[in-house]
Amino acid sequence: MKLTCVLIIAVLFLTAYQLATAASYAKGKQKHRALRPADKHLRLTKRCNDRGGGCSQHPHCCGGTCNKLIGVCL
């Protein structure tokens, strides 16, 4: 009988703890937030310019070659 009471109290305590933790996460108190859809989109965007695209002092050409005289990716 005592064991049953202890188990019931333990389950109630753990349930209350989970609900309290879930409430704090819902309010934005978590340490590591999941990426927003906009952040995921930024990671998936292309980071280089196609042939004919502009390039400058820091060339980011997909082909790897930048004509710095005219500022165009080759």
UniProtKB/Swiss-Prot annotation:
Residues 1-22 form the signal peptide. One of its GO terms (cellular component) is extracellular region. Expressed by the venom duct. Coiled coil: none annotated. GO terms for molecular function: ion channel inhibitor activity; toxin activity. Belongs to the conotoxin O1 superfamily. This is Conotoxin MiEr93. It comes from Conus miles. The lineage of its organism: Eukaryota, Metazoa, Spiralia, Lophotrochozoa, Mollusca.
